[in-house]
């Protein structure tokens, strides 16, 4: 089965530089990842125009976010791509937890039948972004996608927002009523505002590898504590479309990311997981993670959405799904404000409600992360005692 083929999106000279025409939109969206694109589509369904700018011109490289929960799938369905995601994605609801080679626990996330969408599907982020870009084309008068448009700085006053944009053809100023910062965990806009994440940083490092192979593994989530193929650490296996499998391996806090990403170090580790099955490396990364958020998500006319506002560990699939909940909460409210049917005070409810949602995700994600990679002492003793009783 063919792997995903990365094709660059076309760069088009902005009208501001092509003929001196000044453009503006009710909403400027910075970031053409899943959250920014979903926000553009959601606003368009409410009749609100947006201009989306991104400094790249290709979908995300590597699978990145893969686990999309039932509620997020329902939101994607409302936005018009739910069926495509369901058709392509790997459906799953069962998870198994092992200690060594022994199964100690299993769970069913959606035991009853009759639902349109499953508990989860696994679908690589690049497919989600591709589907959303194609969906944006259904709103030619409402969504303007501008790739290779890099935000240098933003300013705001009581009348609107101005973004200074750099392109291959030069720089220009883009104006709007509101700006959504959907530019991810390393948000340039958040840094410009001097906003710090508050919460916990986890020093533990993990190897993440997407491998292409033929295997008869069921469509389940498998997690190991101290497996025989990776002693003293933890491991995770997920099936994805195109015969791609996600493998996460705990490395320890002192692992050198650049060394661990080298094929000569990755391949022997993967061989121990998959046995004698032949495989090809599709994507490799090494990461540590945070469970943190900024103090406020709404800063006058600049609104932070998704990873620019809050980040969690990848365990529990609360990152991309949490961002989709932000979109679902915000866009109808922003449409009412832009349309003059509500005041800015309505946006404060987004701030309060999604901070509550982020705090819940951060709490659960932090607990899961501490259980998976406990500190020596009390945390480790608790984890081992819990596993021994399972």
Please identify what each model-predicted range represents.
Residues 1-27, 42-46:
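Extreme N-terminal leader/targeting segments of oxidoreductases
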Residues 23-25, 168-178:
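Core beta-strand elements of the Rossmann-like FAD/NAD(P) dinucleotide-binding domain
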Residues 32-47, 53, 132, 181, ...:
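Conserved mid-domain beta->alpha element of the FAD-binding
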Residues 56:
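Residues in the short beta-alpha loop(s) of Rossmann-like NAD(P)-binding domains
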Residues 61-139:
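Active-site-adjacent segment of FAD-dependent monooxygenases/related oxidoreductases
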Residues 103, 133-134, 143, 172, ...:
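Conserved FAD-binding catalytic core of PHBH/FMO-like flavoproteins
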Residues 147-161, 285-286:
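A conserved short coil-to-beta-strand element within the FAD-binding core of flavoproteins
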Residues 375-390:
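Catalytic cores of secreted or luminal carbohydrate-active enzymes
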């Amino acid at each position: 089965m063919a792997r995903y083929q990365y094709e660059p999106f076309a760069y088009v000279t902005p009208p501001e530089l092509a003929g001196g025409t000044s453009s503006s939109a009710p909403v400027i969206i910075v970031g053409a990842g899943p959250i920014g694109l979903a926000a553009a589509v959601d606003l368009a369904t409410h009749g609100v125009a947006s201009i989306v700018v991104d400094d790249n011109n290709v979908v995300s490289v590597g699978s990145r976010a893969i686990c999309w929960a039932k509620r997020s799938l329902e939101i994607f369905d409302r936005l018009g791509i739910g069926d495509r995601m369901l058709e392509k994605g790997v459906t799953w609801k069962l998870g198994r937890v092992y200690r060594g080679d022994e199964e100690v626990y299993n769970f069913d996330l959606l035991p009853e039948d009759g639902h349109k969408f499953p508990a989860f599907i696994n679908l690589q982020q690049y497919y989600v972004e591709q589907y959303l870009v194609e969906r944006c084309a259904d709103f030619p008068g409402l969504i303007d996608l501008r790739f290779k448009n890099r935000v240098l700085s933003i300013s705001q006053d009581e009348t609107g927002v101005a973004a200074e944009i750099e392109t291959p053809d030069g720089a220009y100023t883009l104006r709007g009523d509101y700006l959504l910062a959907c530019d991810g965990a390393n948000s340039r806009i958040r840094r410009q505002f001097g906003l710090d994440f508050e919460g916990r940083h986890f020093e533990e490092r993990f190897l993440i590898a997407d491998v292409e192979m033929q295997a008869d593994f069921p469509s389940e989530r498998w997690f190991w504590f101290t497996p025989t193929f990776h002693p003293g650490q933890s491991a995770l296996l997920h099936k994805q479309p195109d015969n791609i499998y996600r493998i996460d391996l705990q490395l320890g806090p002192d692992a050198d990311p650049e060394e661990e990403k080298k094929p000569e170090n990755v391949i022997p580790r993967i061989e121990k997981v998959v046995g004698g099955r032949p495989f090809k490396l599709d994507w490799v990364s090494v990461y540590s993670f945070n469970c943190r958020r900024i103090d406020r998500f709404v800063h006058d006319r600049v609104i932070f959405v998704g990873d620019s506002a809050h980040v969690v560990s990848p365990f529990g699939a609360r990152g991309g799904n949490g961002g989709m909940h932000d979109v679902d909460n915000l866009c109808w409210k922003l449409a009412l404000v832009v349309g003059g049917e509500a005041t800015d005070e309505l946006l404060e409810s987004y701030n309060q409600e999604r901070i509550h949602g982020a705090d819940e995700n951060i709490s659960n994600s932090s607990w899961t992360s501490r259980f998976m990679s406990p500190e020596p002492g009390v945390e480790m003793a608790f984890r081992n005692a819990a596993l021994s009783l399972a």
